[in-house]
């Protein structure tokens, strides 16, 4: 719905309710105006629930409705139906205003200020340096990237952060395997990306550990050497990490994932220790008999039991920190650096308990309030054969997935058009559109069973379908330009069929969908909106002759409508990090 009309109606209704409340000597705390689509289009374009006001004002619904209708006057057609007031827009004005707004604002169409001046940090990706990115990482990456763009479109100041986990037992496992089986190989010698090479050694370690009881002890010894700064160990660690990080960054570049700041855990992991010691001095946590520093956190309570607490270690007795301690240090670092209003962690649902604990402790130690921290948990990406396990090599690597999809598309392109020269770029863009859309169209809290064939479909709810509709509209516009028809004035009054009206209503709701996606922290809102718009235009295109040389005025109007659809689809694709292609 046109936001200007929505605001206008809300202002009228709010003013009317306030006046009625004053007349009836009733104190109003808040006016909640519920607007929704009527169940049938013939009832109107918008339905307003009046019954709620009737309960507050203790007046008959018909009295309130009559007063609102008086205030609306002849601006909109109105009709009372029981507890609802149905509104019909002036279609001609609505169509003209919507098309003009989109085609004038172009890539800025849909941008709003609901989060104006709000400083938001989004931490996402956060890979380990012992393996390449896999499809689960891709879901994390695209959620973080897309949500960042959506929040920016709603006026927020967004900072995208990546904390690379480059220390700990996971990288030591790859290091140990490299020492035993590496034979001084390199990415160049092995003809592999660095992250893939390191991932191979991670799998080799787990094979080795199955038959060697001392493997875990060897890992702990290697970790101790690293912590003590042993020169050879640190050199090996730096070399393997460099290979892994270079490989991971290459995948980011391929998938168009960017960050404003990248942290390495090895550079900041000690900061949290100082915070805990300060909390101990202030009596916010306590020292256990064995020397460990702890804090009591509330457990989940049921309806009949009193709140129970359990002990949580923040610093071990030997003075070493745990992941929670490091995360506390990271919060302080970012608060000092960015002075954020909100920090969002895009992390899988298996970490829900960790973040509940982290946020509670951060609040308890006075670092920041719990409601400034958000764990945006997402569901797992599973394969038809079951859950992925990196240590067993049972994963779909991101690079390999993109390559496999691209190869499938290249074969199809060569079948249809062997003369295409840029087929590799086209195939890459289609594969990225397929992956990103497939991972975003499902609500983020739900698990996904990844289906390659479904993701590549050109006829269903998929990225390639939306890309195809965009390319189809561009082709229509190019054909129109070749005709060079005179179009001094455009008569939007000629757009009278129901398909055109349906498309206009969908286009006009784009800003509302961005706002909803921002508030819900859910890119699937935009993904499914883009599919709805693309599908509606496809139906229109099949049923309607858009370019008719014998009806130039009607053609001009329909072309301007098509331009508005394409611009809105392109804006959606930007928010979803899906490549737009003029031709496919």
From Swiss-Prot:
SMART domains for the chain: Arg_tRNA_synt_N, DALR_1
Gene label: argS
InterPro entries: aa-tRNA-synth_I_CS (IPR001412), Arg-tRNA-ligase (IPR001278), Arg-tRNA-synth_N (IPR005148), Arg-tRNA-synth_N_sf (IPR036695), ArgRS_core (IPR035684), DALR_anticod-bd (IPR008909), Rossmann-like_a/b/a_fold (IPR014729), tRNAsynth_Ia_anticodon-bd (IPR009080)
Upper lineage: Bacteria, Pseudomonadati, Spirochaetota, Spirochaetia, Spirochaetales
Main subcellular localisation: cytoplasm
Catalytic activity as recorded in UniProt: tRNA(Arg) + L-arginine + ATP = L-arginyl-tRNA(Arg) + AMP + diphosphate
Molecular function GO labels: arginine-tRNA ligase activity; ATP binding
Coiled coil spans: none
BP GO terms, sorted: arginyl-tRNA aminoacylation
GO cellular component terms, A-Z: cytoplasm
Keyword Aminoacyl-tRNA synthetase: yes
Location within or outside the cell: Cytoplasm
Motif ('HIGH' region): 127-137
Leader sequence residues: none
Transmembrane segments: none
Protein name according to UniProt: Arginine--tRNA ligase
Family as reported in the entry's similarity comment: Belongs to the class-I aminoacyl-tRNA synthetase family.
């Amino acid at each position: 719905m046109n936001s200007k009309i929505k605001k206008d109606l809300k202002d009228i209704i709010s003013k009317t309710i306030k006046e009625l409340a004053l007349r009836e000597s009733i104190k109003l705390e808040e006016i909640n105006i519920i607007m929704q689509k009527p169940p049938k289009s013939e009832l109107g374009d918008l339905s307003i629930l009046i019954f709620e006001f009737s309960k507050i004002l203790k007046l008959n619904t018909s009295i309130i409705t009559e007063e609102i209708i008086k205030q609306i006057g002849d601006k909109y057609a109105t009709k009372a139906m029981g507890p609802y007031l149905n509104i019909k827009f002036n279609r001609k004005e609505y169509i003209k205003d919507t098309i003009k707004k989109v085609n004038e604002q172009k890539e800025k169409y849909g941008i709003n200020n609901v989060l104006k001046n709000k400083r938001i940090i989004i931490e996402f990706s956060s890979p380990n340096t012992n393996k390449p990115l896999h499809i689960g990482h891709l879901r994390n990456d695209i959620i973080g990237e897309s949500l960042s763009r959506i929040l920016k479109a709603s006026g927020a100041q967004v900072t995208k952060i990546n904390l690379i986990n480059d220390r700990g037992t996971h990288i030591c496992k790859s290091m140990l395997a490299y020492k035993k089986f590496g034979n001084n190989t390199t990415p160049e010698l092995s003809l592999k990306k660095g992250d893939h090479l390191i991932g191979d050694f991670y799998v080799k370690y787990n094979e080795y550990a199955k038959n060697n009881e001392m493997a875990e002890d060897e890992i702990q010894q290697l970790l101790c050497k690293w912590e003590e700064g042993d020169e050879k160990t640190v050199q090996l660690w730096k070399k393997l990490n460099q290979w892994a990080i270079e490989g991971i960054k290459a995948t980011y570049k391929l998938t168009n994932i960017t960050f404003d700041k990248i942290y390495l855990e090895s550079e900041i992991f000690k900061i949290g220790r100082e915070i805990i010691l300060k909390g101990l001095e202030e009596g916010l946590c306590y020292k256990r008999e064995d020397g460990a520093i702890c804090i009591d956190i509330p457990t989940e309570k049921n309806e009949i039991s009193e709140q129970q607490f359990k002990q949580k270690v923040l610093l071990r007795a030997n003075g070493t920190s745990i992941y929670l301690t490091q995360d506390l240090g990271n919060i302080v670092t970012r608060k000092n650096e960015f002075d954020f209003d909100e920090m969002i962690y895009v992390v899988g649902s298996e970490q829900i308990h960790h973040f509940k604990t982290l946020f509670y402790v951060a609040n308890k130690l006075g670092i920041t309030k719990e409601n400034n921290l958000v764990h945006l948990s997402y569901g797992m990406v599973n394969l038809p054969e079951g859950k992925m396990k990196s240590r067993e090599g049972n994963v779909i690597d991101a690079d390999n997935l993109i390559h496999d999809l691209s190869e499938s598309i290249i074969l199809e392109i060569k079948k249809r058009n062997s003369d295409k020269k840029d087929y590799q770029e086209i195939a890459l863009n289609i594969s990225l559109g397929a992956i990103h859309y497939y991972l975003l169209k499902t609500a983020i809290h739900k698990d996904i069973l990844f289906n390659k064939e479904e993701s590549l479909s050109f006829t269903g709810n998929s990225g390639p379908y939306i890309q195809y509709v965009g390319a189809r509209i561009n082709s229509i516009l190019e054909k129109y330009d070749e005709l060079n028809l005179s179009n001094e004035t455009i008569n939007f009054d000629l757009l009278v069929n129901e398909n055109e009206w349906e498309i206009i209503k969908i286009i006009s709701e784009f800003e509302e969908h961005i706002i909803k996606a921002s508030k819900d922290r859910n890119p699937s809102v935009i993904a499914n909106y883009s599919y709805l718009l693309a599908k509606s235009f496809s139906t229109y295109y099949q049923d309607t002759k858009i370019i008719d040389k014998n009806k130039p005025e009607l053609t001009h109007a329909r072309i301007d409508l098509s331009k508005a659809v394409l611009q809105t689809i392109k804006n959606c694709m930007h928010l979803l990090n899906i490549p737009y292609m003029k031709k496919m």
